[in-house]
Amino acid sequence: MVMNVRVLTPTRVICSTTADEVILPGLTGLVGILDGHAALITALDTGLLRIKLNEKWTPIILCGGLAEIDRNRVTVLVNDVEELVAVELNEATTELEKATLAVENAETSKARLDASIELKKAVARLEGMNYLS
């Protein structure tokens, strides 16, 4: 049996589909969701959402939010999403290195927080490249 999955931002529906499996970027690590999962509401971190249907994975970069799992329905409410585009591995690696340096060189708490969010996005982009081929 498949699950119904919806990914929503405050301004639009990103996707509404079915899935065999969903992997969410939780605050304390990845959360795997299969058919019949116990009811759950969980906070989401910036990272890569993975939706699997018929042995094909669809990646979506999330920018924080929450997810509600209820029977065979997964609703993901996020602040924003980032389009995952095919880029060269060198470019993605360079972005990751720049983001890492920005975190290390941040002089204020706000700058460090902003840089850490960009670092999480860079990691998600690099991870997401595995699903684009």
UniProtKB/Swiss-Prot annotation:
Q: Per the record's keyword annotation, is Transport included, yes or no? A: yes
| Pfam families assigned | ATP-synt_DE_N
Q: Which UniProt keywords apply?
A: ATP synthesis, CF(1), Chloroplast, Hydrogen ion transport, Ion transport, Membrane, Plastid, Thylakoid, Transport
Gene3D superfamilies in the record? F0F1 ATP synthase delta/epsilon subunit, N-terminal (2.60.15.10)
Q: Which InterPro entries match?
A: ATP_synth_F1_dsu/esu, ATP_synth_F1_dsu/esu_N, ATPsynth_dsu/esu_N
The subcellular location is: Plastid, Chloroplast thylakoid membrane
Membrane topology per the entry is: Peripheral membrane protein
**What is one cellular component GO term in this UniProt entry?**
proton-transporting ATP synthase complex
Q: Which GO terms describe its molecular function?
A: ATP binding; proton-transporting ATP synthase activity, rotational mechanism
Q: What is its main location?
A: plastid
- Presence of keyword RNA-binding: no
The function of this protein is: Produces ATP from ADP in the presence of a proton gradient across the membrane.
Q: How does it assemble?
A: F-type ATPases have 2 components, CF(1) - the catalytic core - and CF(0) - the membrane proton channel. CF(1) has five subunits: alpha(3), beta(3), gamma(1), delta(1), epsilon(1). CF(0) has three main subunits: a, b and c.
State the family it belongs to. Answer: Belongs to the ATPase epsilon chain family.
| HAMAP family (alphabetical) | ATP_synth_epsil_bac (MF_00530)
Name of the molecule in the record = ATP synthase epsilon chain, chloroplastic
Organism annotation: Trieres chinensis (Marine centric diatom)
Q: Give the lineage.
A: Eukaryota, Sar, Stramenopiles, Ochrophyta, Bacillariophyta
